[in-house]
Amino acid sequence: MPPHGGDTLFANMYLAYETLSPGMRRLLDGLIAVNSSAKADVTKTREDRIRDAARPDAKHEYVVEHPVVRTHPETGRRALYVNGGHTVRFKDMSEAKSASLLQYLFAHQQRPEFTCRFRWEVGSLAFWDNRCVQHNPINDYHGFRRVMHRVTLAGDRPR
């Protein structure tokens, strides 16, 4: 563990969706987001992680479409399902036409009332559900290494 920093922010996407205006929720409910592994914000760190894992596909771009709002299969609650690291545009819209609404949604998702900050310590263990929570590791421990082990479970396709 680094002597300082390295916390992770978690954001509740149920609340992010539920606090949008009724008109905004109606607009978003039918939209599909296009997500890319090659988005400039994440491409470099992704390539480094895959290269470090000795995978030959580090530079391969993965593109997938998901609903902007998904329904959690177990709770039935609706959650905002766009991500500043991967969502590049809305289906049938250009990146330029999508940009303003996406930037609004990305900022909305990060509102303090939706987030908590997890301070890692030796032996810490965290569980979260990517279907309704987003996480953001804070890279503020320059010159130090943070080693963690992650397990990702297979899940359902967003609906």
Model-found features: residue ranges?
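Non-heme Fe(II) oxygenase catalytic core, chiefly the N-lobe of the double-stranded beta-helix
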Residues: M1-L125, N130-R159
